[in-house]
Amino acid sequence: MICETEKRLLPGAACAVLFVHGILGSPAQFAPFLPLVPQDWSFCNLLLQGHGGGARDFSAASMAVWREQTRQAFAELRAQHETVVIAAHSMGTLFAVQEAVRSPVEGLFLLNVPLHVHVRPRALRNAWLNYGGTPRDPWGQAAVAAYGVERDRNVLHYAGWPPRFFELFGEIRRTRPLVRQLAVPCRAYFSERDELVSVRSARGFADVPQAVVTMLPHSGHAYYEAQEDLPLLQCGFRAMLQQCEKKR
């Protein structure tokens, strides 16, 4: 499990990427993309407070803290670089959209934006795996690998979790109308087999002129199918960085 923010801040670098994970997620989710960041770019792979620790650490955090963390991390990169791209997953995409509306952001690379949520049986199965089960297929293995909280079998330690999810639903409602205000290049990817984010979420980008929306037919919320979908994501990530670099 990753327990701290990973940074590469290069003196004199003109471009940077900010990576923001989702609720109960981890910076490890961006492992397929970090090697694609050009060597002359800076990056910050942010660890949100309450992640990388135990169940009670997560309870002690809040949406307001995570939002402010993202803003501060972006401001740090913005102060030192001409170009900043935000790459985000799930809840992190909500903060990315908010930041792009209020601040100069050169590009967004968004994975599974939760504008509309549903809970499929696989989500419950993954929750059990994260509690202490043994993953036996790539979907379960991906869910456990992306999980950003230490396993804890004491159910009392989870008592503070419901407020965090109520806050998440509030953040979704708050962000949904902001999407159509986006005026920056944006690549948004949605998994057709996502167990948490409804594909209805993709419709929110229909009126965003600079948004390119792509559906991933074989992937889920944390699992990205390796033969077709993941290479497509990596190609899109490279293209976004190249597009933003050319704008300089």
Describe the residue ranges of each PLM region:
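Catalytic histidine-centered segment of alpha/beta-hydrolase-like enzymes
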Residues: 219-232
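Conserved alpha/beta-hydrolase
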Residues: 38-55
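Active-site nucleophile loop of the alpha/beta-hydrolase fold
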Residues: 109-119
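The serine-hydrolase catalytic nucleophile loop
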Residues: 24-34
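Gly/Ala-rich beta-loop-alpha elbow adjacent to hydrolase catalytic centers
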Residues: 88-96
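Conserved alpha/beta-hydrolase "acid-adjacent" motif
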Residues: 27, 195-201
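Short beta-strand/loop motif that positions the catalytic acidic residue
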Residues: 181-182, 188-190, 194
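Active-site nucleophile elbow and catalytic-triad environment of alpha/beta-hydrolase enzymes
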Residues: 161-179
